[in-house]
UniProtKB/Swiss-Prot annotation:
Principal subcellular localisation of the protein: membrane
Organism listed in the record: Cryptococcus deuterogattii (strain R265) (Cryptococcus gattii VGII (strain R265))
Residues passing through the membrane, by range: 510-530, 539-559, 589-609, 614-634, 648-668, 757-777, 1193-1213, 1229-1249, 1268-1288, 1314-1334, 1353-1373, 1465-1485
Protein name, per record: ABC multidrug transporter AFR2
Phenotype upon loss of function: Does not affect the susceptibility to azoles, but displays slightly lower minimum inhibitory concentrations (MICs) to cycloheximide and higher MICs to rhodamine 6G (R-6G). Causes further increase in susceptibility toward fluconazole and itraconazole, when AFR1 and MDR1 are also deleted.
KW Repeat (keyword) present: yes
UniProt-annotated glycosylation sites, renumbered to this chain: N235, N318, N742, N1434
Domain ABC transporter positions: 144-394, 845-1087
GO CC annotation terms, alphabetical: plasma membrane
Keyword hit for Transcription: no
Start-end of Polar residues biased regions: 1518-1529
Pfam family, one: ABC_trans_N
This protein's UniProt keywords: ATP-binding, Cell membrane, Glycoprotein, Membrane, Nucleotide-binding, Repeat, Transmembrane, Transmembrane helix, Transport
């Protein structure tokens, strides 16, 4: 039923009325979501007007009967503006739903799904490798994995244990439990997403007569799982995204007799209306890097897309994440209506479930560490546990109460039940199974199974209904709705939509390739049709074929970027992954054709390649065919691998092998027998051979150089001279092209079209692999949350538990350690914390008339409007407001963290201006938990303590303080745990505690700012965080904290509240009061409706001021505040604080400074707490540690350098000193340079990781200087560069045999040492060049593209493909600028200079001397002038002459001279130093905020203005907008 899911969001149904016995059908016209970030396209006033109109409409329609303004009963034929028009304000969702349901019934019975499960168990397989991988222990991991594989030692890990339940069609189930309890696994199991997890054999599931195997296979799209992450194509509009989903599941014969496209468009419009995103129809979806709709709107796009899948059984995993509680309630009410009218069954996991949302559900399942402790009606759950002996506080919501039962620190037994209530998950599960409710459930399951036997009547009805919707051309058991051709067509249209939406990459590549063609064409401009162009023509065709072949290498990255989306759509049964693969390849063909024409046309005619129509079109044919072959090859690699790392590693070596064995760098005759097969399997080799044949076959080339020639040989005729080129015949002034390629390359004309056929075969083979792998190989299986420790530091509690099934490193849920209460109890320091160690604070921070203005699209916008307030020691102040009110922006302004716009107003510490040290004396806990993933918890805290506490405090004292904070935050049990990444490392709560700890160990002397500390956490964790903050304030900490719609219990923990309306306007600042009484009284006396008993004051307050969805207030609350006596009191208090504290502060400051030395006073008010030298040592050690603990980075370097060295070394094994041997040695150096790009791609992501952490958290808190950041990252690469140099030296230098060339002049050691130094300079240049390029660029990908372009330029102009003397005059400067010029000269001269040349048989030139002369007599003058040697000087016929006798002659052809070796070495140091200086300069120019230092601290705060340079405004604004809620998508 492709339309059924639309009902998920239709209308707003009030479940509480039905529960109380009121008639069914209380509906508003649509679901109104208040967005996290309002749309950038609408000014604030427009948003407010829209909210007011929506509220008015809601009030009109919320009554027992719905007023119908259009008598039409055809859901698809309606008048514009009627109540069936999705774009009308009168749209009546309930009426539309009823009519749609009736229309569907005329086409046959609607499909419905429910399920029962008995003894449901789910398991995975894990291993014991739960220690941190480092460069040192990674080999041990490999050995252990091999042992496990051979011995099949993987442990079975039980995730879910013996669960039972039943969900009828049209029922809603809420799944409650803390992270790690099994909620996600349960939903995935129901929906059939069993990637890496397995059903126990004893499990029994019945989907109304359908077996699990069938629901996971042929009915895959009928039960879907929607994850909490939002994955979409960022450059498609919302309309395009949802249209695609609607068309993919549109039935074969839509109701109403309309076409499938009309049906899909109508369904899209309805869904957008229902979810309140109609205004985003033509707005791109966006993501974290591409600006599009806001985060809340993107979440609704995800929900709408899943709704359009039309599944009768839907599983939603924390889909309300990113929505505030009011919008979460709206989402659940929409699901309720969907269930009641369309019969859709849904199972929903919610971490923070408001009571109103909970009331929408029929049933609840409570999970506790993989055990089911309740399943039944939502109305029965609370009483069940109360009867068991637990106490539910009056102000605690039912879902919070149920979740709290899984936390030993939160659950409370009723009086008289101490010691009688269960305490472990197993005891809870046992009590549940002994209860009457459990017996009732078993009876319901038995009744369900009797009613719906497997493959019974309901199964046949379901099958017939599904088949009626499917295309006629589908096989009977296909889960898809469209035929395969229809799927390809749909994906193809989407592909071209994506191309039109973002043509930048395509156009950039076209332009870049055109520029490259111009550059290469100008380097080889107008080649003469003589033998002097032979080498150049070969080099040109070699480079041209490589450009055609490797232009598709980026497709690996592109495919991985969309892989998650394709797999999601496959789970929804939108299309076969292979259909998208076909469409993706077809979408790229126009670009490939254009690129082939633009690049090859320019190159071909600029360089004077064979100007014949047939030759030109054959050149184009081979180039395009090879492009397609290589595209399929790279796509096959991407689809065969499960992760990007797995794909890139073999791709790098494959590229090297393909280039090496093309036939130019090593010709066929010189390929070693054991490596010849690589040439046979190399598609590029066949293309290169055909192009060489195409260029040289049947052509005669004028000889440009004869032997002998010059003075004394003017009369040489006939066979007395010969052209100095392979294939020449004595006496002939021309050389046959066929003879040249036959002798030099062993290429033959008969292979020309054969090779084309082989390329077609390669194309078909790789295409088949690509499509097959895409269809059957999914991305890497996910692992659950586990804690990772350095080897040898795993806590005994974890080691003990690892012998059992729980807590595996592969535990999909991972709650057995990371979130499990039993384990948590054993390893945490609960009840031992001493919060008294927190530094007592005495300073009062106050602000008055704070205004913040910025420019958006050249229009001024006020973000904060005359905000007043203060934070006193020992108080916890909440900062709340509607979405877009500027809460985070106010924190940033107060903490001196904004670097753009204009800030005015007073911000005082004890009545005095903030000084330069203000930022490092305050703690700022950001919403994002950013930490270096390789550090342990203790190391992260020590790093902060060392650099941010005063330098006068000893290291020992700092470390002792860290230990105290670990105990205070109850982190000592996992102090040695590695931060890791989400899933493999700290869980959400542990990360939040670490974020707070990093700021606490800095001993903030003034106050602590926290931005949304409970965001994304479950209710239990949120409560723990608030209790921690409360504990801190009780010991003197001053805290200002933003929070988004807290529960009533959380809200009561705050002392004061600063509430902002949209536009940064103050609505209230004052005490909250016991039971929120003071706050409630203020609003009630100023016109708000009375707060009902038991209502959450935070939610009531939002509704009172008109900020909740669908609500509106006639009171101007900002103006009310301005005119209130409370504000007058606030202003008076601010004046008093400034007067009294200012005087005290001045006196205290003088006394304190009097007792200190001048140096101590200077240090106290310095920008950084530690001196630069100390910063450098500490930061350098951390960067080094990061590298050591990222074995994938270092071992990838080792693998690349060693395998490339061995590959090149043995491909040119024992290269001789013949002319071909010398050319091989030249190309062995050239090929070694090709690893430059891969090394760069390895360095840049690590640098960006460090930089992100530094810029977002460490720089604003003044932890250390940006200069130290750059230098430490550069210096840390030096040891690894030295190690890689040693590896390359031994794997490359000795196999090729360079050392043998130094034996004649007894310089083996000197030249060997020089070669090692040059290798090190190559690697040092690579490291510093990489950091210089990425220093000022946002992403590693962009920097990598720029680096590759510059690298290509350096390679083209280094003198190998075209010598400096042969370059056009215009490009000579590039030859001089390229650092590779000096690397090639230095390395090659040191490698082969000053030794003899020994020609091979085919390199000798044969001619006859004049009658009566010997060969030696005839050639003596020529040899004296030009060099070379004769085989037999006394011969009188058939003189065999080698045109070179010394390797220096060969080197001179490339303008390489051994005498320049030390000059070149010195110049390379100049390049390295330049890179370092440029890296520092570029970073300062591009990324260091300007004018944020002394000027800000010294200027009077009431006139302070800061305007950022124009070039950084937009980027910085985007950063602020994502965190501040002050801007819109």
């Amino acid at each position: 039923m492709a339309f059924a899911g639309v009902g998920q969001g239709i209308g707003t149904y009030d479940r509480t009325e039905q529960a109380s016995g009121a008639p069914l059908g209380r509906v508003t016209s649509r679901a109104h979501f208040t967005d996290i970030h309002p749309s950038d396209d609408l000014p604030a006033q427009t948003e407010e007007n829209r909210a007011r109109e929506v509220g008015h409409l809601a009030r009109q329609l919320t009554r027992q009967s719905v007023t119908v303004t259009d008598d039409s009963t055809d859901v698809f034929s309606y008048q514009e503006g009627s109540d069936l028009d999705p774009f009308s304000d009168k749209f009546n969702a309930k009426k539309w739903t009823k009519l749609m349901f009736e229309a569907v019934q005329t086409c046959g019975p609607a499909r419905k799904a429910g399920l029962s499960f008995r003894n449901l168990g789910v398991h995975g397989f894990g291993s014991d490798a739960d220690y941190q991988k480092t460069v040192g222990n990674l080999p041990l991991v490999g050995i252990g994995s091999l042992r496990d594989l051979i011995g099949n030692r993987k442990r079975k890990v039980q995730i879910l244990n013996s669960m039972d339940g039943v969900l009828e069609a049209g029922e809603m189930l809420v799944v409650l439990g803390p992270p790690g309890s099994g909620c996600t696994t349960m939903l995935k199991t129901i929906a059939g997403e069993m990637n890496g997890i397995y059903l126990d054999e004893s499990s029994s599931l019945n989907y109304r007569g359908i077996t699990p195997k069938e629901i996971y296979g042929q009915f895959r799209g009928e039960a879907i799982y929607t994850a909490e992450v939002d994955i979409h194509f960022p450059n498609l509009t919302v309309g395009q995204t949802l249209s695609f989903a609607a068309e993919a599941r549109a039935p074969r014969n839509p109701p109403g007799g309309i076409s499938k496209k009309e049906y899909a468009k109508h369904m899209r419009d309805v869904v957008m209306s229902v979810f309140g995103i109609s205004h985003t129809l033509n707005t791109i979806v966006g993501n974290d890097f591409v600006r599009g709709v806001s985060g809340g709107e993107r979440k609704r796009v995800t929900i709408a897309e899943a709704s359009l899948a039309g599944a009768p059984l839907q599983c939603w995993d924390n889909s309300t994440r990113g929505l505030d509680s009011a919008n979460a309630i709206e989402f659940c009410k929409n699901l309720r209506l969907n269930a009641d009218y369309m019969g859709i069954s849904s199972a929903v996991a919610i971490y923070q479930a408001p009571q109103s949302a909970y009331d929408c559900f029929d049933k609840v399942s409570v999970l506790y560490e993989g055990e089911q402790i309740f399943f039944g009606k939502t109305t029965d759950a609370k009483q069940f546990f109360v009867d068991m002996g637990f106490h539910c506080p009056s102000q605690q919501t039912v879902p919070d109460f149920l979740t709290s039962l899984t936390s030993p620190s939160e659950r409370r037994p009723r009086e008289g039940f101490e010691g009688k209530v269960p305490t472990t998950p197993q005891e809870f599960a046992a009590r549940w199974k002994q209860s009457d409710k459990y017996q009732e459930l078993l009876a319901q399951i038995a009744e369900f199974e009797n009613k719906y036997p497997v493959h019974g009547e309901k199964y046949r009805e379901f099958l017939e209904s599904r088949r009626a919707q499917q295309s006629k051309h589908l096989r009977s058991k296909s889960p898809y709705t469209l035929s395969y051709g229809g799927q390809v067509e749909l994906c193809l249209r989407r592909g071209f939509d994506r191309l039109r939406a973002d043509p930048s990459l395509t156009l950039t590549q076209l332009f870049g390739n055109f520029i490259m063609a111009l550059i290469i064409g100008s380097v080889f401009y107008n080649l003469p049709v003589t033998t002097s162009s032979f080498y150049s023509r070969g080099a040109l065709l070699f480079f041209a074929i490589l450009m055609s072949a490797f232009g598709s290498a980026l497709e690996i990255l592109i495919l991985y970027a969309q892989r998650g989306i394709v797999e999601k759509h496959s789970r929804y049964a939108f299309y076969h992954p292979s259909a998208e693969a076909v469409a993706s390849a077809l979408t790229d063909i126009p670009y490939k054709v254009m690129n082939c024409i633009i690049f090859n046309l320019t190159l071909y005619f600029m360089t004077n390649l064979r100007r014949e129509p047939g030759a030109y079109f054959f050149f184009m044919l081979i180039s395009f065919t090879l492009t397609m072959v290589m595209s399929m090859l790279f796509r096959s690699i991407a689809s065969l691998s499960r992760s990007l790392t797995q794909a890139l590693a073999p791709a790098a070596l494959l590229i090297l092998g393909l280039v090496m064995y093309t036939g130019f760098a090593v010709n066929v005759a010189n390929m070693r027998g054991w490596a010849r097969w690589m040439n046979w399997l190399d598609p590029i080799a066949y293309g290169f051979e055909s192009l060489m044949i195409n260029e040289f076959h049947g052509r005669e080339y004028e000889c440009s150089t004869f032997v002998p020639m010059g003075p004394g040989y003017e009369d040489a005729t006939g066979q007395q001279h010969v052209c100095s080129t392979a294939g020449a015949v004595a006496g002939s002034s021309v050389v046959n092209g066929d003879a040249y390629i036959n002798l030099s390359y062993e290429y033959y004309h008969a292979h020309k079209w054969r090779n084309f056929g082989i390329l077609i075969g390669f194309f078909l083979f790789f295409t088949a692999i690509y499509l097959t792998a895409t269809e059957f190989i999914t991305a890497k299986k996910s692992k659950g949350e586990i804690l990772v420790f350095p080897r040898g530091k795993i806590p005994h509690a974890l080691l003990a538990q690892s012998t059992h099934s729980h807590g595996s490193s592969d535990d999909v849920e991972g709650g057995k350690f990371a979130g499990g209460s039993n384990m948590k109890k054993e390893i945490t320091g609960a009840d031992r914390a001493n919060a008294g160690i927190i530094q007592k604070q005495t300073a009062i921070f106050s602000w008055k008339d704070v205004v913040y203005d910025i420019k958006i699209k050249k229009e001024p916008r006020r973000i904060l409007d005359h905000v007043d307030g203060w934070v006193k020691p020992g108080t916890l102040t909440a900062l709340m407001g509607v979405s877009g009110a500027g809460k985070t922006t106010l924190l940033d302004v107060l903490a001196t963290r904004v670097t753009m716009g204009v800030v005015t107003g007073e911000m005082l510490v004890d009545g005095k201006q903030r000084d330069l040290s203000f930022q490092r004396k305050t703690g700022y806990v950001q919403q994002q938990d950013l930490h270096l993933e390789t550090s342990t918890v203790r190391e992260a805290l020590r790093f902060s303590a060392i650099l941010r506490q005063p330098n006068t405090v000893s290291i020992k004292e700092k470390y002792e303080y860290v230990e105290e904070v670990l105990k205070l935050l109850e982190m000592d049990g996992y102090a040695d745990a590695v931060v890791g990444v989400p899933g493999t490392g700290l869980n959400v709560e542990q990360r939040k505690r670490l974020t707070i700890g990093v700021e606490l160990v800095a001993k903030p002397a003034l106050l602590l700012f926290l931005d949304e500390p409970t965001s994304g956490l479950d209710s239990q964790t949120s409560w723990n965080i608030l209790l921690l903050l409360r504990k801190l304030t009780e010991h003197g900490q001053a805290i200002l904290c933003t929070i988004h719609q807290p529960s009533a219990m959380l809200f009561e923990q705050f002392d004061r509240l600063l509430f902002l309306a949209r536009g940064g306007k103050t609505v209230y600042f004052g005490e909250v009061g016991k039971g929120s009484r003071i706050l409630i009284d203020y609003f009630e006396k100023n016109g708000a409706s009375k707060c009902p008993e038991g209502e959450n004051p935070a939610e009531w307050m939002l509704a009172a001021i008109g900020a909740a969805p669908g609500s509106h207030s006639e009171v101007d609350w900002h103006q009310t505040w301005i005119n209130s006596p409370e504000r007058i009191e606030v202003r008076s208090e601010l004046a008093r604080i400034k007067e009294t504290q200012g005087g005290k502060g001045e006196a205290a400051l003088q006394n304190k400074d009097y007792e200190k030395s001048k140096a101590e006073v200077k240090a106290e008010y310095a920008e950084f707490a530690s001196p630069l030298w100390k910063q450098f040592i500490v930061v350098l050690m951390r960067v080094w540690q990061q590298h050591w603990r990222t074995p994938s980075y270092i071992w990838a370097k080792v693998a690349l350098c060693s395998l490339s060295g061995l590959f090149i070394g043995f491909s040119f094994f024992k290269a001789g000193t013949s002319q071909q041997g010398l050319q091989n040695q030249l190309f062995s150096v050239f090929m070694m340079f090709t690893i430059f790009g891969q090394l760069t791609q390895q360095i840049m992501p690590n640098f960006v990781t460090q930089r992100s952490l530094y810029e977002v958290r460490e720089r604003p808190s003044k932890t250390y200087s940006w200069k130290i950041f750059i230098l430490s990252n550069i210096v840390s690469e030096i040891p690894w560069a030295i190690l890689m140099g040693v590896i390359i030296y031994f794997t490359w230098y000795y196999p090729i045999g360079y050392y043998r060339n130094a034996i004649p002049e007894d310089a083996v050691h000197l030249r060997g040492a020089l070669m090692f130094l040059y290798i090190e300079m190559f690697l040092l240049f690579n490291a510093t060049f990489s950091i210089m390029i990425v220093a000022g660029i946002a992403t590693a990908e962009t920097a990598g593209n720029i680096a590759n372009l510059l690298f290509s330029m350096c390679l083209i102009f280094c003198g190998v493909l075209a010598s400096g003397s042969s370059l056009p005059g215009f490009w000579v400067f590039m030859y001089r600028v390229s650092p590779f010029t000096y690397l090639v000269e230095g390395m090659l001269s040191v490698a082969v200079a000053n030794t003899d040349v020994v020609c091979s048989d085919i390199e000798f030139l044969t001619f006859n001397p004049p009658s009566g002369q010997s060969c030696g007599d005839y050639m003596s003058t020529f040899i004296t002038n030009y060099g070379g040697y004769l085989v037999d000087e006394n011969a009188t016929t058939a003189c065999e002459f080698c045109s070179m006798s010394k390797t220096n002659t060969f080197l001179a052809q490339f303008d390489i001279y051994y005498s320049n070796k030390w000059r070149d070495f010195g110049l390379l140091w100049v390049y390295v130093v330049f890179n370092v200086i440029a890296a520092i300069g570029i970073y300062w120019l591009a990324r260091v905020p300007k004018n944020t230092g002394k000027e800000r601290a010294s200027e009077p705060e009431d006139v302070q203005e800061k305007q950022v340079p124009a070039q950084s405004t937009e980027k910085k604004y985007q950063s602020i907008s994502r965190s501040s809620e002050s801007t819109v998508a």
